[in-house]
Curated annotation (Swiss-Prot):
Species, as recorded: Solidesulfovibrio magneticus (strain ATCC 700980 / DSM 13731 / RS-1) (Desulfovibrio magneticus)
Protein known as: D-alanine--D-alanine ligase
GO biological process: cell wall organization; peptidoglycan biosynthetic process; regulation of cell shape
Cofactor(s) this protein requires: Mg(2+); Mn(2+)
Gene label: ddl
Family annotation (Gene3D superfamilies): 3.40.50.20, ATP-grasp fold, A domain (3.30.1490.20), ATP-grasp fold, B domain (3.30.470.20)
C-alpha cells in the first residue's frame, strides 16, 4: 500500500512524534509499503489532498494536533483509513478532566482532581491534601508537569501550565509503583512496571532518554493485580469509545490501582512502552505496525 506517514505537527511533543516516525517508516518499508512522510502543518486542505492520494494514513502524532481528534475528523470526512481511535474518543482521552469524569461515572478508580481554567488565575486550592501533581489538561509526555509538595509552590506550577496556553489539572499525588497496560484490538497486552532511575516520577527524561528508567515486562506483581490492570485498561478503552489500541497509565497506591489517563497514540520510539509490551506478547515492531494497519482497515470498513 501507499501509506502517508504523518508526524511532527506543532505540539510540545513534536520531537517525540518525529523520533517515533523514524522507527515506523523503517517498519513500514520492511513490510513492503511505499511510505510518504508528511510533516503536519495548518494546511488542512493540503493534508487531505495528500491523504486521498494514499491508501492509508499512519499517524505518528502526540498531543494536539493528533490526539485531539483533528486529523482523524479530516480523514473520516475524506474517507481515508488510519490506525487508532476516531475523533470523539481521541479528544475525550486527551482531555484529562473529561476522561476522569467518565472514569468516575463508570466506577473506574482514579485519583481526585481539580480542573483550573487558565483564565481563573493561580489562587485555586484543591480540597484534598498535598502532594499534588499539576498537569496541562491537554498535554502529554509529562511535559510542563510539576510535583507540588508545599501549597506555596502551587501558583508557580499553575503559571507554568498557563504560560503554554493550556488549562490545568491538579491531581492527587498518590505514592506507589507506576504501571502501564496497553490494549491491542480487544485484548490487553502484558503490563509494565516502571521504575525511574532519577527524579520522583516518570517524567519526560525518564520516558525518552535511553536507560533513564527500568521498565519491567511483564510487571512483577501479583496475578490479581495483573488481572485488574487488564480489566481496567479494557474498561477505560470502552468507556472512552476507543478502537484499535490504547495504553492506560496507573499508580498502585496502598488503597489499590488508580487509573491516571489513557493514551490513544502511544509512543513508538525505541524506548517506548507499547512496543516493549508487544514484544513480550511475541510481536516484533513490524508485527505491531502490521496489526495496527489491519485494525485500522477493519475499523474503516465499519464506518458508514
Amino acid at each position: 500500500m501507499k501509506i502517508l506517514l504523518v508526524a511532527g505537527g506543532w505540539s510540545s511533543e513534536r520531537a517525540v512524534s518525529l523520533s517515533g516516525a523514524v522507527q515506523i517508516e523503517k517498519a513500514l518499508t520492511s513490510l513492503g509499503h511505499e511510505v510518504v512522510p508528511y510533516d503536519l502543518s495548518h494546511d488542512f486542505p493540503g493534508f487531505v489532498r495528500r491523504a486521498k492520494a494514499c491508501d492509508f494514513v499512519f499517524l505518528s502524532l502526540h498531543g494536539a494536533p493528533g490526539e485531539d481528534g483533528l486529523p482523524q475528523a479530516l480523514l473520516d470526512a475524506a474517507g481515508v483509513p488510519y490506525q487508532g481511535s476516531g475523533p470523539a474518543g481521541s479528544f475525550l482521552a486527551l482531555n484529562k478532566a473529561a476522561s476522569k469524569q467518565l472514569f468516575l461515572e463508570a466506577c473506574l478508580p482514579t485519583p481526585r482532581w481539580t480542573f483550573v481554567p487558565r483564565d481563573a488565575g493561580t489562587s485555586a486550592r484543591p480540597d484534598f491534601p498535598l502532594p499534588w501533581f499539576v498537569k496541562p489538561n491537554l498535554g502529554g509526555s509529562s511535559i510542563h508537569m510539576t510535583l507540588v509538595r508545599r501549597a506555596e509552590e502551587l501558583p508557580a506550577a499553575l503559571e507554568k501550565v498557563f504560560a503554554h496556553g493550556d488549562d490545568a489539572l491538579i491531581e492527587e499525588g498518590l505514592s506507589g509503583p507506576e504501571l502501564t497496560c496497553a490494549v491491542l484490538g480487544d485484548e490487553a497486552l502484558p503490563p509494565i512496571l516502571i521504575r525511574p532511575k532519577a527524579g520522583e516520577f516518570f517524567d519526560y527524561a525518564s520516558k525518552y532518554e535511553p536507560d533513564a528508567a527500568d521498565e519491567i515486562c511483564p510487571a512483577p506483581v501479583e496475578p490479581a493485580v495483573t488481572e485488574e490492570l487488564s480489566r481496567l485498561s479494557l474498561a477505560a478503552h470502552r468507556v472512552l469509545g476507543l478502537c484499535g489500541y490504547s495504553r492506560a497509565d496507573f499508580i498502585l497506591a496502598p488503597e489499590g490501582l488508580r487509573l491516571l489517563e489513557v493514551n490513544t497514540l502511544p509512543g513508538m520510539t525505541p524506548t517506548s512502552l507499547l512496543p516493549r509490551a508487544a514484544a513480550t506478547a511475541g510481536l516484533s515492531f513490524a508485527d505491531l505496525i502490521a496489526r495496527l494497519i489491519e485494525l485500522g482497515l477493519a475499523q474503516q470498513a465499519k464506518r458508514p
